[in-house]
């Protein structure tokens, strides 16, 4: 075991599993055991592991600009292209896109946007958010509070 803290995991009840590599829809542990990875790496590998088109696109972007934040009105061509592509996909006129790091980040931002909206329209008392029980919405504080899974609350 390493010095890592594992999210939503009780290692006394769950044996540690070391995943070493992935190919297509399969991942392999450090003993060579193959597993069908049915959750797309928690939703981040829906195009499969080792997809050469994705690998090359990521490598090219890393060579061009490995990272740049979007705070303070900064942007970059890849972010603008992605935002425009996503906005063109939705049936909303003049759509806007928020690019975040995760679904948890997106849900936290939605909570903030809702609070901002209702304050802006003079309805600050509207602060309750309805969420589904036994549904996963993320592990950040706001997203976990929306999640109906009690282990995610601690």
Task: Label each residue range with its predicted role.
Residues 84-154:
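PLP-dependent aspartate aminotransferase-fold enzymes
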């Amino acid at each position: 075991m390493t010095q890592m803290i594992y999210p939503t995991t009780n290692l006394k009840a769950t044996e540690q599993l070391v995943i070493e590599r992935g190919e297509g829809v399969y991942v392999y542990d450090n003993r060579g055991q193959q597993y069908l990875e049915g959750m797309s790496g928690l939703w981040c590998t829906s195009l499969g592991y080792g997809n050469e088109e994705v690998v090359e696109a990521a490598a090219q972007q890393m060579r061009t600009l490995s990272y740049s934040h979007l705070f303070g009105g900064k942007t970059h061509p890849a972010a603008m292209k992605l935002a425009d592509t996503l906005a063109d996909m939705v049936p909303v006129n003049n759509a806007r896109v928020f690019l975040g790091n995760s679904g948890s980040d997106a849900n936290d931002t939605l909570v903030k946007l809702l609070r901002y909206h209702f304050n802006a329209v003079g309805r600050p008392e509207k602060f309750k958010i309805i969420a589904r029980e036994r549904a996963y919405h993320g592990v950040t504080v706001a997203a976990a509070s929306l999640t109906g899974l009690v282990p995610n609350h601690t």
